Structures are given as C-alpha cells and as structure tokens.
A protein has these predicted regions:
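Transmembrane helical segments that form the transport core of multi-pass membrane transport proteins
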Residues: 243-356
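Alpha-helical transmembrane segments and their helix-start/interface "positive-inside/aromatic belt" motifs
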Residues: 14-22, 46-52, 80-91, 148-153, ...
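Helix-loop-helix junctions within the multi-pass membrane cores of secondary transporters/permeases
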Residues: 78-80, 87-158, 336-417
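Juxtamembrane and boundary regions of transmembrane helices in multi-pass small-molecule transporters
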Residues: 2-3, 138-153, 168-169, 173, ...
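Intrinsically disordered, low-complexity non-transmembrane regions of multi-pass membrane transporters
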Residues: 1-19, 23, 74-87, 202-213, ...
Length: 516
C-alpha cells in the first residue's frame, strides 16, 4: 500500500497543475468583476475564494482517484459481464447497476426537492428506474450493433411529444433532470462499463460503440420526469434561494464550511457504496484480481471519496452564493445585456472545472488512439458550453420558452448525426451529460437565478433550464468537430494515388453486427 501511495505522488502533482488551469481562470474572472462592475460583500468573496481552494484540491484528488479506481472497476465489470454471453444476466445486472448508482446520486435529491407536487421517493425511484432501463438498452445497442442515431431520433421524438402535454412551469426542470442525474460519480463508471463491454467485440465498430452509454442514460430521467409531470399534473416547482453568508472573522468563515463537510461525507459515502458492493460481488464470483490491483483500486477510491467531498463542499458552500449574488448585481445594472458575454466567458472556462470532463477527454484520446486529442475535446466542450450559457442568459433577460432553443437544437444535432462518423455522434451525446455537472448546478444555475430575480422574471420557467442548455450544445460542437475531421480525411484521400486510395478504402469499417 505504501508503494502505491508513493507511486501516486508524481501523478498528484500533475493533476494539481491541471486543476490550477481549470479553476484559476474562473477565480480571475470573478475577481475582475468584483473589483470593477459587480461589487460583492467581503463575506461572499471570502467564501468564494475558500470554496475555490477546496474545489482545486478536490479536482486534483478526484481525477487521479477516478483513473485509479472507477475506470478499471467499470472496464473489468463490463468485460466480465459481456464474457458471460448471458442476455438475461446482462439485462438484470445492467438494470441493477443503473438503478443503484442513480438512486444514490446526491444531485437527484436536490432535483426532487424542486418538484413539491411529486412525492420525493416516487420521483427518485422513477428516475433511477429510467436510468436502469436505458443502461440496459445501451448495453443491448452495443452488443447488437444498433446505430445510436436511430435510437436518439426515436426517444427524443417521444420526449418532445410528451413535452406538449406538460405544464410550461415544469418543462425546464424536466429537461434539467437529464443532466443532473449523470453526475461526477456515475459518469466515469458508466463510461468505463462501455469500454469494457466494447473490448469483447472484435469488429471494427467496437471503438464507435464504446461511447453512447451516458447519452442514452440521460434520456431515461427526462422521460421519467415528463411522464410523472403528466400523471401528477405537476404544474409547480419551487425555487429556494441560497442563503448569502455573513461572516465577521476567519473562525466564522471556516465554521460555514465545517458545517457542510459532514453532509457531503455522508452523501458521497452513500453514492460510492453501491458501486463498491457490486464490484465486491464481481471480485468474489468472477474477477479474482490480485492484491496489488485491489490495493491500487482501494487507494483510488479513497482519493475519489476525498476529492468529491472537498469539491462538493467548496462548490455548494462557496460557489453557489457567489454565483447567485453575482447574477443579481450584473442583471441589476442599467447595462444588463453585459450578462450575456460575461456568462459566455464564464461558461467557456467553467466546463474545464467539471470533474468528469477530465475522465471523458482522457478516455476519448485513448479509445481513438490520439485521433481526437483531449485538448481538442476540451475546446469543443468549452465552445459548446459558452454558447449555451449565452443563450440561457438571453432566456433570463427575455423570458423566451426553453422549447424555442431545445427543439431546433436537438433537431439539428440529430440531423447531422446521420452524416457525421458514428464515433463522434456517440462522444458528442455523452459529452452533453458530462458537461452538465455540479459546476453548472452550483454556479451557472445560481447565476441565472440571481439574474432572474433582478429582472423580475419567473425563476421556474426562465432560470431553470440552464443545465438542459449546457447538455445540448456540446452535441452540436463535438459533432461539427467530427464533420470537419471527416472532410479533411476525405480531402487527403482524394489527393492520394489510385493504389493508395484503394488500400485506404479496404481499411474502411464494414457494417458487421456482433453475434452473441
């Protein structure tokens, strides 16, 4: 164990540098605003800075921990599950995994509290069942080679059909649920499961189909919440504004964070427990990993736990009040339109601080053998989130319905999926769920809510929906990146001699379907 800890120290330094690159731009933007056009109280500023420090350390531990534990656990479980060649077992275990992981997701409780007309446990169990069912569907898609765009067209058509029967006060929360439930705990594990399942396949489509699990798992909660909204006639959602901190000294400042820590210690322990128990069963029954591998996974789980506790405490106690107050101050100015470019700037950098984004970018680079670099993925995600936050701020200032953005956005994203290489489509729809993580929920959403209060808008219809917008735009930007790459490849092929061109076409993947 000591050797494992020592070996991880150089990696921790590397992860610290990555975390600094992610968090410092956000801190710099907020500080510039605080000292120029958006003055805020010293209490809120100090909470924000201490929260930023905790987020910094949290990202450092989480990214290394997920690399050491969540990814290898998911890959091995996915591989072992597929090796059984037992369809009933894959279905039952897949559903159980999706259900247990989701039911323990901390953000799901927050979502349930926003919809008082539906009993909390009814909503939580329904959303968890939705994720479980769609995780099973994602497994079956990979095993039988079903094209992802077909499923996306089918299910998003059903979603928008159901949306016509749901009260407008409930729409934004329903669409937010898809991004909220694929949090930093579930995403790395679900993505690793996909890589493990695809690893068993020997055909050339395996890499394409190793992504797409998060995409389908994000559909389940939206459908579940929309159906519940119709069944319960859920016409109301609630907005509970964050309590703005007031501290007189450093002891009171630390007291705020110390009171929050036990809550997140408990929440993250509850989230990790189902994953650990399921892995324990796999280890005893089938995996039989050696002690060194188990020790490495155990250290990784400890890092993951510590990192997420620090991250969520810093985000909820430090970032949430600052985001809300900053939104109020900016939208309260005579030049409130400045909220749009500032929101876009914050959106560009804030996605880099999402814990699961690191896992996605690294996995994309590995699975594509460097054809899609982590840096290129990061830029595509940043551009997408920047655009989505800008559009969300337009909604806050104008009160335009979220459907005016979601219907054209998803229609365009699904339309281009028919001509974009399948790998890019799967990655893009996964990226939507990954980008809409806790940083969106604890800073961007409060920013929109604070701005909505300042302009006198309807918070439930105008401010909620930021998560849904952030989940939508990467679908377009990542696929456009794929389309550009494909056009460049075709241009290069045309420039090749005839014999080289023939060889290149011989290497193109066929449409073979895996047999169980």
């Amino acid at each position: 164990m000591d050797n494992i800890l020592k070996a991880s120290l150089p990696k921790l330094r590397e992860k610290l540098l990555e975390a600094l690159q992610a968090v410092l731009p956000i801190v710099a933007i907020v500080l510039v605003l605080c000292f120029t056009i958006a003055p805020i109280s010293p209490s809120i500023l100090l909470c924000f800075l201490l929260g930023a420090a905790m987020i910094l350390v949290g990202i450092m531990f989480f990214t290394l921990g997920a690399e050491m534990s969540m990814s290898p656990m998911g890959e091995r479980m996915g591989t072992m599950l597929t090796k059984t060649r037992s369809l009933p077992l894959i279905i039952w275990v897949g559903f159980l995994l999706g259900f247990l992981i989701t039911i323990s997701e901390p953000d799901l409780q927050v979502l349930a509290n926003q919809v008082p007309s539906i009993p909390n446990m009814t909503l939580i169990l329904s959303v968890a069942a939705g994720v479980g069912l769609f995780l099973v569907l994602a497994f079956l898609r990979m095993l039988f080679g079903i094209p992802l765009p077909r499923l996306l067209v089918l299910f998003y058509s059903i979603i928008f059909l159901l949306a016509a029967f749901v009260p407008k006060e409930f729409l934004a929360v329903a669409f937010d649920s898809g991004g909220v439930t694929t949090g930093p705990m579930t995403v790395p594990f679900i993505m690793a499961l996909g890589v493990g399942v695809a690893a068993i396949r020997s055909d050339r489509h395996a890499a394409d189909d190793s992504f797409g699990l998060v995409a389908l798992c994000s559909v389940g909660p939206i459908l579940a919440v929309l159906i519940l909204g119709i069944a319960f006639q859920a016409s109301d959602s609630t907005y509970i504004p964050p309590i703005l901190p007031e501290v007189n000294d450093s002891v009171e400042l630390w007291q705020l964070f110390r009171e929050g820590l036990p809550t997140y210690f408990k929440e993250i322990a509850t989230s990790l427990l189902p994953i650990i128990l399921m892995f324990g069963v796999f280890q005893l029954v089938a995996l039989k990993l050696d002690k060194r591998t188990i020790g490495r996974i155990a250290v990784g789980l400890a890092y993951t736990y510590m990192g997420l506790v620090l991250f969520l405490t810093g985000a909820n106690v430090g970032f949430m009040p600052a985001g809300n107050y900053l939104g109020q101050v900016l939208a309260g100015q005579s030049f409130r339109w400045v909220l749009i470019p500032i929101g876009m700037l914050i959106g560009y950098f804030i996605v880099k601080a999402e814990p699961a984004v690191y896992v996605l970018n690294k996995q994309v680079e590995e699975v594509t053998d460097g054809a899609i670099s982590a840096q290129a993925m990061g830029m595509a995600l940043s551009a997408g989130v920047s655009l989505s936050v800008g559009l969300a701020m337009v909604r806050v200032l104008t009160g335009v319905s979220i459907l005016w953005f979601l219907i054209p956005g998803y229609t365009f994203a699904i339309a281009i999926s028919l001509i974009v290489p399948k790998l890019f489509t799967a990655i893009a729809f996964d990226a939507g769920g990954v980008a809409s993580g806790p940083m969106t929920a604890t800073f961007l959403l409060p920013l929109a809510q604070g701005a909505c209060v300042a302009v006198g808008g309807n918070i439930v219809t105008d401010a909620f929906g930021v998560v849904a917008m952030v989940a939508m735009t990467p679908l377009i930007t990542v696929q456009l990146m794929g389309l550009i790459a494909e056009l460049k490849t075709r241009k290069a092929r045309k420039a090749q001699p005839a014999f080289a061109l023939a060889a290149a076409y011989a290497e193109l993947p066929d449409d073979a379907i895996i047999e169980l």
